[in-house]
């Protein structure tokens, strides 16, 4: 597996348009205050006089003309139709079906990449719940809603993690009492505190995930083998230890796909809807508390 890091200086078409649009906004605000510098000994203070902007203040025609083409292009992109959903996808912490949907799509995309690039399947996918900011509601889903749900520029990443650290990963998930997940079924017991929680049973999906049906009808039969490595789909925030996933920093190899998670969600939502005219509500239990 190669450690492929994308050129972060290279902007996508959508990113370029956004940056130019924001530049135009900054130009508007640049005329909203005046400053002067006052020096005292070696220290320089900047005094700003703010100018209130009301509806009565006329628009700047040059700024409007500058922004107009980028604004029109962005509005067209944000209104792009993706799919239609029949049931809500909630951002309930740890256990929401929005997280299960996103993790499913991460695994489906990651498996296609891992088979093509490395000749082996991706075993499972996890995400951090903090990457989602709202949910989906019944009705049409547009690109604008995807930006509202996932506003961050995290990308899909594949990590090759030794089994001993995979064990630590599942132990941490037990302490969290769940996380967006796909490709495994796990139970955990509660201790006096969350740090005392322990995962009790774990079964990994025994089949490669090549289709939506593989996701919806998994074969949870494989136990964890700490003597081997696992290929896991995560995001670029988690791979550097974000949200406490520090065990991922022990990955033997890391493959940055260069694909934004929002793009993954858009592509897979569209594919599932075009195939089935329906988005499964993802009500399947994947991580659950084992009563004592």
PLM features: what roles do these ranges have?
Residues 1-14:
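N-terminal secretory signal peptides that target proteins for export/translocation
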Residues 13-25:
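Sec-dependent N-terminal signal peptides
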Residues 28-31:
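C-terminal motif of bacterial Sec signal peptides marking the signal peptidase cleavage site
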Residues 34-55, 100-103, 107-292:
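Feature captures C-terminal
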Residues 41-77:
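Start-of-domain marker
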Residues 56, 61, 84-88, 168:
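Coil residues (strongly favoring Ser/Thr
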Residues 76-93, 245-251:
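Acidic/histidine-rich, surface-exposed loop or edge segments in extracytoplasmic proteins
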